[in-house]
Amino acid sequence: MTAAAVFGCTGAVGSQILATLLASDAFSSVATVSRKLPTAESPKLQAIEEGDTSKWGTTIASLSPKPSVVFNAVGTTRAAAGGIQNQWKIDHDLCIEIAKAAKEAGVKTYVFISSGGTRGFLSRHVPYSKMKIGVEDAIKELGFEHAIILRPGMIIGREKSKAPLFEAIVGHLNKLGQGVQDRIGQDQLIIGRAAVAAARLAEDGKAPSKFWAVEMSDIVRLGRDEWKE
């Protein structure tokens, strides 16, 4: 069985990753590092509360057992961070720091929750996309045994919506056909399950490539259509 660590465990996708890991027999222990403790409980959960995000990365090397897989679902909004510069410190700088620390600690599989459309025609001119591109490129350069980048569309099913109107619209697109919704947004549960499923494939030596970008269609396939408990 595998040991895992999760960063961003209290967010929409991160909480689903955590719940999925705790319910899976494939993972023997799960550690989390966050500003506030997750609500989930389990005998195999080691939850670390650390308000100073600059210390997050260094905790990886001290975890016991040492995680083979690290999931990073850290993310915020410009409004919540108090401006684009502060958002950059979290969504870009902190995420790269965690990835570097994971590599130094000997983590084999690194899973990062990015965003769909980050490699589009105009994406390099959009601050949010530039953050995600920077993190993706840094992870690739670190040379993990397996690096997995999930690029979901709009996240739906959240308790606290970041874009209530748009999320509500996307959330009802399945009435026009599930495929219509799948091409635009995915439920947080499906994204979380897809992240864990991809990590399990990598750990079993079944990932399609060393650097695997999991796009929306694969997220739906792994997290819903082919999902097995």
From Swiss-Prot:
Give the main localization category.
mitochondrion
The way this protein sits in the membrane is described as: Peripheral membrane protein
- Boundaries of the annotated transit peptide in chain numbering: 1-44
Q: Which UniProt keywords apply?
A: Membrane, Mitochondrion, Mitochondrion outer membrane, Transit peptide
Q: Which InterPro entries match?
A: NAD(P)-bd_dom, NAD(P)-bd_dom_sf
A Gene Ontology annotation in the biological process aspect, one of them, is: import into nucleus
**Where does it reside?**
Mitochondrion outer membrane
The record's annotation in Gene3D superfamilies points to: NAD(P)-binding Rossmann-like Domain
Recorded GO CC terms: mitochondrial outer membrane
Sequence similarity: Belongs to the FMP52 family.
In terms of PANTHER family, this protein maps to:
OXIDOREDUCTASE HTATIP2 (PTHR14097:SF7)
Name of the protein: Protein fmp52-2, mitochondrial
Taxonomic lineage of the native organism: Eukaryota, Fungi, Dikarya, Ascomycota, Pezizomycotina
